[in-house]
A protein has these predicted regions:
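N-terminal secretory signal peptides that target proteins for export/translocation
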Residues: 1-10
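Bacterial N-terminal signal peptides
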Residues: 16-26
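Primarily membrane-embedded glycan-assembly and transfer machineries that use lipid-linked glycans
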Residues: 13-18, 207
Length: 342
């Protein structure tokens, strides 16, 4: 390992650190790896779930998580009314494309820590006979100062995907340090234990840079501990993920490692889809990473909405010889894409 003498000049030390960073990036890029999917194509040119009516989903239906249960596709999605209040909608499908929605949300703000803007961005992972739902409570009510608005990662459990037991906020920001200083969001749980622990990737803020990816571990899926005192995956200048590196659907275990799809945003805040491979023996170690996005906004409804130029993948289902990817378009609609299993 290259060591930088403590007496070196600031410029020399900075140069050496840059060299170290380039060596690390080269090492990641050198690992041969092919993602477990082929080219992505849209299964439908139009949204498969869109806002409707005057109620809880009148302004937005997006950022879906999908699992298969008893032969049906079950979707939880972020719903938004015209006042900006957030809740989780519920829909089912026989074919993964045409969904029937419940007339009422399956989760609304009820717990004291959820009061404010509501609950959003579900991610589902089944372990044993229990479904674990990570979601975000977001305080965005009118009149709250911008520096007081925040989001925290929460957990709920269920056996039927309808009745949920809240487990509380599961990651508390460490405001005194340099990492995980403000918001926590987007918990993507690894489906099986590694080294005797469960692992989860999530979004948080570093003091010098917002929207980085962290990693935590747990023995019971309820109580979580930071694995590192720095991000496990950082943004990269000049690339599609220069501003945001946010976990997508829960990862899958492949022969090559822990495979995670993530959502990246560039300097213009265009959101597209990347991937990263972590070591199965050490979930904090990056083995390979996408150098360009595999999916990006193209359709008008992906470019124009509540937030322009966004495809945000949160749902992933293997359906025989194909993958189904469920995503939010421009923070307003739900879309679905597919790719062959490799």
């Amino acid at each position: 390992m290259l060591k930088v003498p403590y007496f070196a000049t600031r410029a020399a030390r900075a140069s050496a650190v840059t060299v170290l960073a380039l060596i690390a990036l080269a090492a990641v890029a050198a690992v041969p790896f092919t993602p477990p999917f082929g080219k992505w194509t849209r299964l439908s040119p139009d949204p498969i779930v869109s806002p409707r009516g005057e109620g809880f989903e009148s302004a937005g239906t997006f950022n879906p998580s999908v699992v298969k249960k008893d032969g049906k596709y079950v979707m939880l999605y972020r719903a938004q009314d015209r006042n900006g209040t957030l809740s989780l909608g519920y829909a089912t499908s026989d074919d993964g494309i045409r969904f029937n929605r419940r007339p009422e949300p399956v989760m609304v703000s009820e717990a004291p820590y959820e009061k404010g803007g509501g609950v959003e961005d579900p991610r589902l992972q089944k372990v044993g006979n229990t479904y674990y739902l990570t979601y975000t409570r977001y305080n965005n009510v009118d009149g709250v100062a911008a520096d007081k608005k925040d989001a925290q990662l929460c957990l709920a459990t269920s056996t039927d995907l309808i009745h949920w037991k809240r487990q509380g906020i599961i990651i508390i920001p460490g405001y005194g340090g340099k990492w995980n200083v403000k918001w926590t969001k987007s918990g993507a749980i690894v489906p099986e234990k590694i080294n005797g622990k469960y692992w989860m990737y999530y979004l948080a803020d570093a003091r010098e840079k917002d929207s980085q990816m962290g990693v935590v571990y747990s023995e019971d899926l309820l109580h979580w501990t930071e694995a590192l005192d720095h991000p496990v995956l950082s943004s990269r200048s000049g690339l599609f993920d220069s501003q945001v590196v946010e976990p997508g659907p829960p990862p899958v275990i492949t022969p090559g490692g822990i495979f995670l799809i993530y959502n990246g945003a560039d300097d213009k805040l265009v959101y597209s889809t990347g991937w990263v491979l972590f070591d199965k023996k050490d979930p904090t170690k990056v083995l390979a990473r996408a150098q360009e996005p595999v999916f990006a906004p193209e359709k008008e409804w992906e470019k124009v909405g509540q937030v322009p130029n966004v495809v945000f993948v949160e749902g992933l289902v293997r359906d025989g010889k194909r993958w189904l990817f469920y995503y939010g378009g421009a923070d307003k609609n739900v879309g679905v894409a597919t790719a062959p299993v490799l």
